[in-house]
């Protein structure tokens, strides 16, 4: 009789509680588990990134040793720089506000990392994301996590069917407190470790500094202007501003002023009243759908314009070149180019795209 081989899974280890419990849960379920940590940025002492890398690697290896599973380190610095860090900087330079986690999930965690895992003979990769992956009617679908406060499906809309069939996310069945309780129960020292909230490759959370130090193009100061083009003052470079911003403008106009537009061609930041940042129509590009390959007709659904935003009712309409028009029932505050708009029907993640342009119906 031929003995059935265990399914092999490579878990992306960050040194945090979610990925650590993911590895534990899968080992308990009988998988052959390997812990793998990605090195995605070189690290500098002055901004804290070198210390962060060292902490991630040390913590991840300690957890793997504790769980008695192999630990592997993989260098993805070149891929990360090309697919995440460089586009991140370019977006800011061109007046957009990017979400690097979306780029990273698309190109690194669920592409380059998946390929490395397959090279190791893995059947699956697993991460500590809070989301539910379910097979249904011949498709692999993504549903919101049990813990709606930790749900991370917004970041996963770019995943393709060939990737999803190799991905496990066991944390989706639990809330955060349950995950911490499991970690504590099995004796993991990191059970109370604080969740990371900053951009992973910018530990000091100063994206302006990061771009100035790493971009080949010199960041120029420019003019704050009103809607008619009248100069109101000087700004410190468009990379430092985003739509809807009020604080940190460094300009006094005698009344509240908000960033209502950024014009990279003129190196201008347009200031205006708060009402000007409310719009209800956007065009999204690079759209991906998960339950089906292509949107063929208008559909009413729930749309989110940023990770922390509440979903709002909208209609989406297919356009040419993998784009959609999104029309919200109500005007939304600070729809921002470069961010993602993500679509749901109830708890099912339908897909999403990158916000390319914004307009208003009135």
From Swiss-Prot:
SUPFAM superfamilies assigned to the protein according to its UniProt record, in alphabetical order: Adenine nucleotide alpha hydrolases-like
Entry-linked CDD domains: MnmA_TRMU-like
GO molecular function per UniProt: ATP binding; tRNA binding; tRNA-uridine 2-sulfurtransferase activity
Coiled-coil residues: none
Binding-site residues, ATP: 12-19, 38, 128
Bridged cysteine pairs (disulfide): 104-200
Region (Interaction with tRNA): 150-152, 306-307
Keyword Repeat recorded: no
Keywords: ATP-binding, Cytoplasm, Disulfide bond, Nucleotide-binding, RNA-binding, Transferase, tRNA processing, tRNA-binding
Any one biological process term the GO annotation gives: tRNA wobble position uridine thiolation
Active site annotation, chain numbering: 104 (nucleophile), 200 (cysteine persulfide intermediate)
Keyword Cell cycle: no
Catalytic activity reported: S-sulfanyl-L-cysteinyl-[protein] + uridine(34) in tRNA + AH2 + ATP = 2-thiouridine(34) in tRNA + L-cysteinyl-[protein] + A + AMP + diphosphate + H(+)
Listed GO CC annotations: cytoplasm
Annotated site residues (Interaction with tRNA) in this chain: 129, 339
Family per record: Belongs to the MnmA/TRMU family.
Function in brief: Catalyzes the 2-thiolation of uridine at the wobble position (U34) of tRNA, leading to the formation of s(2)U34.
Family matches, as PANTHER family: MITOCHONDRIAL TRNA-SPECIFIC 2-THIOURIDYLASE 1, TRNA 5-METHYLAMINOMETHYL-2-THIOURIDYLATE -METHYLTRANSFERASE
Protein name per Swiss-Prot or TrEMBL: tRNA-specific 2-thiouridylase MnmA 1
Species this chain originates from: Clostridium tetani (strain Massachusetts / E88)
Upper taxonomic lineage: Bacteria, Bacillati, Bacillota, Clostridia, Eubacteriales
Chain's gene name: mnmA1
């Amino acid at each position: 009789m031929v003995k059935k081989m265990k399914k092999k899974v490579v878990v992306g280890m960050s040194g945090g509680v979610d990925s650590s419990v993911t590895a534990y849960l899968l080992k308990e379920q009988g998988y052959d588990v390997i812990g793998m940590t990605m090195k995605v940025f070189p690290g500098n002492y002055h901004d804290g990134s070198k210390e962060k890398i060292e902490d991630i690697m040390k913590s991840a290896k300690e957890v793997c040793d504790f769980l008695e599973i192999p630990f592997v380190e993989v260098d993805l610095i070149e891929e990360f720089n090309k697919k995440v860090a460089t586009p991140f900087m370019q977006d800011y330079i061109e007046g957009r506000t990017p979400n690097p986690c979306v780029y990273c999930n698309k190109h690194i965690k669920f592409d380059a990392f998946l390929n490395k895992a397959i090279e190791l003979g893995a059947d699956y990769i697993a991460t500590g994301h809070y989301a539910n992956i379910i097979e249904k009617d011949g498709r692999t679908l993504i549903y919101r996590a049990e813990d709606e406060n930790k749900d991370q499906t917004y970041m996963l809309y770019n995943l393709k069917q060939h990737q999803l069939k190799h991905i496990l996310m066991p944390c989706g069945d639990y809330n955060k407190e349950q995950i911490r309780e499991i970690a504590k129960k099995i004796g993991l020292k990191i059970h109370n470790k604080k969740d990371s909230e900053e951009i992973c490759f910018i530990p000091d959370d100063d994206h302006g500094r990061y771009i100035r130090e790493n971009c080949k193009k010199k960041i120029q100061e420019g003019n704050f202007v009103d809607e008619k083009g009248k100069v109101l003052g000087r700004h410190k470079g468009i990379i430092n501003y985003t739509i809807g911003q009020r604080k940190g403008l460094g300009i006094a106009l005698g009344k509240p002023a908000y960033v209502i537009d950024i014009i990279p061609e003129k190196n201008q930041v347009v200031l205006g009243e708060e009402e000007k940042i409310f719009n209800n129509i956007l065009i999204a590009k690079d759209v991906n759908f998960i339950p089906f390959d292509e949107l063929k007709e208008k559909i009413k659904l729930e749309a989110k314009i940023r990770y922390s935003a509440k979903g709002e009712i909208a209609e989406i309409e297919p356009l040419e070149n993998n784009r959609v028009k999104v029309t919200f029932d109500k005007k939304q505050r600070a729809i921002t180019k470069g961010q993602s708009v993500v679509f749901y029907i109830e708890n099912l993640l339908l897909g999403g795209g990158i916000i390319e342009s914004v307009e208003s119906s009135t």
